[in-house]
Each structure stands twice: as C-alpha cells, then as structure tokens.
Amino acid sequence: MQYTYQHIQDLVPGPTPQNFYGKIIFIKKKINQIVVLIKDETQSIYLRVIPKEDQELEFQLRQVVRVHRCKIQSILNSKEGIAQIGLFGCHLIAWSQSGKVDNPVIISSRSWTKSDEDSERLQTLRKLGKSRRKSGRKTSVDTMANKLIERREAMFADTFIKSLFNKIALSRKEHLSRNARELFYHRPGDIVETQNLLEIDDSWFNDENSEQFVQYVLNCTTCHVEYNHVEYAQNNIPTNCRFCQEAMESFHAAFRIRISIETYGVFLTIPLELIKTELDICEDWDSESNIVEEEEKVTRFKKNIQEKVRDASIVHIKGISSLLLIIMLNINSISLVNNITENKRILLQKSNVPSSLQLKILITPFVIVVVRFFGITWIYSGSSCIEEVLNLIDNCSRRR
C-alpha cells in the first residue's frame, strides 16, 4: 500500500489518520504511554504513543520515527499526535541515528513495509541538530520540552476539572431546586417527607442578632387577602398600609427562623401569638395590648428562646401549616434525632418524645415565607404564597 506523508506543519487536526516522519528530541515516559517531542525541518509536535498491553517500546533521543495512521487533535491552541498502536492500523517504525534503512530498531507491526521515501527522509532528519547535544548533560531544548509538557498537562487537567465541577455544580443546583419545589408544592395540612434533617441556623439566636429573629410585624386586615402583603414595623411604630392607606390595626411580634440550605435560604416568620408550647416559654399574646406591654413580652421571649431553640432542627413539616422542632437541650436529645429513619414519614408522637424537648408551632394562613434565592429576597404571605414561591424557584433556576 502506498502511503502519502506530510510535513509536520501540514498536519491537520481531524478524524482522518495521517502519516509523517520526525526526529525525537525529547522523551517523557508516563504510566501507560510515552510522550515524545519530534520535529522535522518545518515544525515540531508532541506525540503520545500508547503501546499495546504486552508491548514495550524503547525510544531513544535522535531516533527517526515514521508514523502511520496517526490521529491529530487540537489541544490548548496547538496540535498533538495520538499514536495508539494497533488501533485502526496505527503503527510506527524507528531508526537509530546511524542505523541502516533495512534495519529499524523499533517495529510496532510485523507487517511493516519499506517506503520509497525512507532513505531520503532519514538523511534529511539525521542532519537536524546533529552537533548540538553534549553527552551527559541536558540541553535547554530538553528542559524547555519538559516544562512545556508538564504545563500542557496541567492546563489540560485544570480545564477538565473545571468542566467537571461545573457539571457537578449545575446538577447540584438542579437537585436543590427540585427539593425546594417538593418542599413548597403541598397544600396546607399535607405531610411532607424530608430526605434528611433541615438544620436551623442558630446564629440568628445570638444576642447581637436578636432584632433579626424577633421582629414586629404589621398585617393589614383590609387588603391582606388581596395583596398577600405583610410589612415590618419601623421603630416599633405601626404605620398605614402603603396599598390601601388604612391604619394597620393588627400588630404583633414575630419569630423568624432561617433554614440552612447550601445554595439558597428559606426563612419562616411566624407571629408569636400563634406559638403554643408545652414549655410555656411565652404567654398567650394579646393583640390588643399596647406597644409597651408587647415589648416587655418580646424581651422575656428573647431570653427564653435563645436557650430553648438553640441547635434546633426541623424534622417534620406538615405542609406549610405546621412545624415540629426538636430542641436539643443536651447530649441525650441528639440520639432522638439520630434514631429517625431517613426517607420515611416522620411522625413523632407525644408519647415517645419528652415534653421538655417538644416545641410545636402552629401556623395559620397568616404565615410569612421569606425566600432568599441566589442573594435576592422575596417576601410572601397568606394561603396562596405556596404557588408564588414555586414559580419563583422555577424562574430563578432558568435564569441561572
């Protein structure tokens, strides 16, 4: 079979196998392959030689190589040859610096044939850099080639790893989005099965953050149902509704919970008048009391909530209408959480949970859901907020 040989500078990356000659000027052995830098009178190219499993190829510097049916690919804005011996007829022949044409030192295929161009190419390539190498010392060419190979491999590895991590991150975001969708896509009263515990960020219960987890909330009873609108009081003073301009008569303090999730945060704000606990850590709230009395109750509640709700985890969500918090007051209570079987419906009855560790928060349609998604905050409230939050998560996922 008559082969057509190209100069290295004329090699074109693509699926078509190509044939060429070159002189080895650098060798670097890898685990399952050999990287050689070969050159001709036009250019140089890196060649990755992948032998067969039972084959050993001993390359030496200044050998002249003839490569048949080699794949040329583009990598990092340069060309690279891949010679996988035996694949699609790929094979190579190598001659020593002073060997004869009929006596090659490396033969990767038993069916090799001599080409009419062998003699001419051997004479030409043997003259390249004939007197530049000094015995026993590495030349600057070797040092530079070694650095280039290591740099190319590092850049290739970095590019591959970045691409891999981007795919993993995208898959993770989609997974979290689906989990959030499942969390909110339930009617009030439905049971939600959680795959794992949703941790509450206890940093909100520090003294310096007390104003963030206990706040004053204004609810306009005139347009609340129509607009699903809830505002926080400024300086603890009720104001008029910005939609209907009517005075907001409903005024109460609220307990705000932040659930720790990797990519986004979900905030639940529950009016304290709706909290009922067997610990009796707060009294029934009187919405008709004046602001001074409300402030006194909030102060008492702050001191108790920092002790009772620290290190809490949400283990059961009954729709958006109720939460069950297990308060881990000591080491013994941690075993209660560890004994919960994942991926199953979690129903903690009063009989098997000590009353001193149980805090149940009943949430009416007044509940406020504050969703912080990719650094942006939306506030929803009322019984129809579930669909709005669901659409919000979908839209944010598409934009990302």
From Swiss-Prot:
Which cellular component appears as one GO term in the record?
nuclear envelope
Q: Is the keyword Hydrolase assigned to this protein?
A: no
Keyword annotations for this protein? Chromosome, DNA-binding, Nucleus, Telomere
- What broad class describes the main subcellular location of this protein? nucleus
Q: Name one GO molecular function term.
A: C-rich strand telomeric DNA binding
Name the organs or tissues of expression. Answer: Expressed in sperm and oocytes.
Q: Which domain of life is it from?
A: Eukaryota
Q: Where in the cell is it found?
A: Nucleus; Nucleus envelope; Chromosome, Telomere
Q: Does the keyword DNA-binding apply?
A: yes
Q: Report any one BP term from Gene Ontology.
A: negative regulation of telomere maintenance via telomere lengthening
User: What exactly does this protein do?
Assistant: Telomeric DNA-binding protein, which binds to single-stranded C-rich repeat sequences, with high specificity to the 5'-GCCTAA-3' sequence. Repeat sequence binding can be at the 5' or 3' telomeric end. May have a role in protecting the 5' end of the C-rich strand of the telomere. Acts redundantly with pot-2 to negatively regulate telomerase-mediated telomere extension. Also regulates telomere length by the telomerase-independent telomere maintenance pathway called ALT (alternative lengthening of telomeres). Through sun-1, anchors telomeres to the nuclear envelope in embryos.
Family per record: Belongs to the telombin family.
Entry protein name: Protection of telomeres homolog 1
Q: Which organism is it from?
A: Caenorhabditis elegans
What gene codes for this chain?
pot-1
